[in-house]
Swiss-Prot record:
SUPFAM superfamilies: beta-beta-alpha zinc fingers. This is AT-rich binding protein. GO terms for cellular component: nucleus. The keyword Transcription applies. InterPro entries: Zinc_finger (IPR050331), Znf_C2H2_sf (IPR036236), Znf_C2H2_type (IPR013087). A zinc finger (C2H2-type) spans 29-52, 321-345, 351-374. GO terms for biological process: positive regulation of transcription by RNA polymerase II; regulation of DNA-templated transcription; regulation of transcription by RNA polymerase II. Residues 138-168, 240-265 are annotated as: Disordered. PANTHER family: C2H2-TYPE DOMAIN-CONTAINING PROTEIN (PTHR16515:SF66), PR DOMAIN ZINC FINGER PROTEIN (PTHR16515). It is found in: Nucleus. The gene is ATbp. May be a transcription factor for genes having (A+T) stretches in their promoter and/or enhancer regions. Binds to AT rich DNA. Gene3D superfamilies: Classic Zinc Finger (3.30.160.60). It comes from Drosophila melanogaster. Keywords: DNA-binding, Metal-binding, Nucleus, Repeat, Transcription, Transcription regulation, Zinc, Zinc-finger.
Length: 388
């Protein structure tokens, strides 16, 4: 009878009693009980019979170094009883031989199966490793593609932002250029309008102080030139007759508005009417005579009258009149306009309403007052003082 055998992956045959270890062409047996290593199968069976009493019929003790052969077994069997000992001897002889033959046969076949199984296992392991490597490579490629796509998206977003910033900058530049052009055009229009207004209203706004009077010749020249309106004078209260030898007498009446009224004798008025009917001289001669008369006029003691030092010449040769009241410093092309402006700085109210006690610094305010309060729409000559 034989022992059950199990072939493992490490080329070892396991039994209930011993372990068959294969190594190349030779093998050895390890006892499970005492872990003794034996070189041959006979030594192994002798060891288990002698040391561990496996056969239960062999009483002879053998040393571990003694050789175990069939002659010793036969001699032991002959010395024993015929019945039981013969059966024991037959068992002792037949079992080791059968075990040796079967173990050798099964070891070769099972070793081939184990080798094939190991090859299959190794092949499967290699396939799994290759699949894992391919999966890792695919993941790496996918991660690279995702990173590349993200980089492209970021570049596109950055490019779009830069393009938007450039578009906004262009729009702002265009708006700024349009605003500058519009401002320049409006400034040109305003300057043109101011120049036109000055040229159109230069004649109307020339107002000389009422206390200044001109000779009949100068008045005739001014009327002939057509540059200044000649308005009738206000009727003053009766005054004593002037002394002989004087062309005209100037009388100052102290009123609530400090107005100065000049009177002209009848003979002077007649001369004016005759001169007005005469031939009109040239405009240049009238302007020259008017400038000379203005230089010969006495200076007014009022603080609102322009001084001789207030005229300033510019780079282009034009003469400007500068307001010297404290820190005003406004420039005017005409002296009369500067004097009209300087009334703003003073407390003088030269224009009185003949219907009430109201007084005003400018004639326009008096005209508005008359229209709103008294519903009067008369000509300016009725409310304005003497102007030259």
């Amino acid at each position: 009878m034989g022992f059950p055998r199990i072939l493992s992956k490490n080329n070892k045959i396991y039994t209930k009693l011993g372990e068959f270890c294969l190594s190349g062409d030779s093998f050895w047996i390890v006892c499970h009980t005492c872990q003794e290593e034996l070189q041959t199968q006979d030594q192994f069976w002798k060891h288990i019979q002698d040391e561990h009493n496996f056969m239960h019929g062999v009483a002879k003790e053998h040393s571990r170094t003694s050789s175990y052969c069939l002659t010793d077994v036969e001699a032991a069997a002959a010395a024993a009883t015929p019945g039981s000992s013969s059966q024991q001897g037959a068992t002792a002889i037949s079992v080791p031989l059968a075990l040796y033959t079967c173990s050798t046969k099964y070891s070769e076949e099972e070793q081939r199966e184990v080798e094939m199984h190991e090859q299959q296992v190794q092949h499967q392991v290699q396939q799994q490793q290759a699949q894992q490597q391919q999966a890792q490579q695919q993941q790496h490629q996918q991660s690279q593609q995702q990173g590349h796509q993200q980089h492209q998206v970021q570049q596109q977003q950055t490019h779009q932002q830069l393009q938007q910033q450039r578009d906004v900058a262009k729009e702002l530049a265009e708006l700024h250029a349009n605003a500058v052009a519009a401002a320049a055009a409006s400034a040109a229009v305003v300057s043109t309008g101011e120049g036109t207004t000055q040229s159109n209203s230069a004649i109307d706004i020339k107002i000389e102080p009422s206390s200044l009077t001109l000779t009949p010749e100068m008045q005739a020249a001014a009327a002939a030139g057509g540059t200044i309106y000649h308005l009738p004078q206000l009727v003053p209260p009766p005054v004593p007759p002037p002394p002989p030898g004087s062309g005209f007498v100037s009388v100052s009446a102290s009123t609530s508005t400090s107005n100065t009224v000049s009177t002209t004798p009848p003979n002077v008025l007649q001369q004016q009417q005759q001169l007005n009917m005469s031939v009109v001289p040239s405009t240049a001669m009238a302007a020259a005579m008017l400038a000379a008369s203005q230089e010969q006029l006495p200076k007014d003691s009022n603080s609102t009258t322009a001084s001789a030092g207030s005229a300033v010449s510019s780079d282009d040769g034009e003469r400007w009149y500068v307001c010297d009241y404290e820190t005003c410093g406004l420039k005017f092309k005409y002296k009369s306009r500067m004097e009209l402006h300087r009334v703003v700085h003073s407390k003088e109210r030269r224009f009185n309403c003949e219907l009430c006690s109201a007084s005003f610094k400018q004639s326009c305010n008096l005209s508005t007052h008359r229209k709103k309060k008294h519903a009067l729409r008369g000509i300016k000559s009725e409310i304005l003082p003497q102007r030259f």
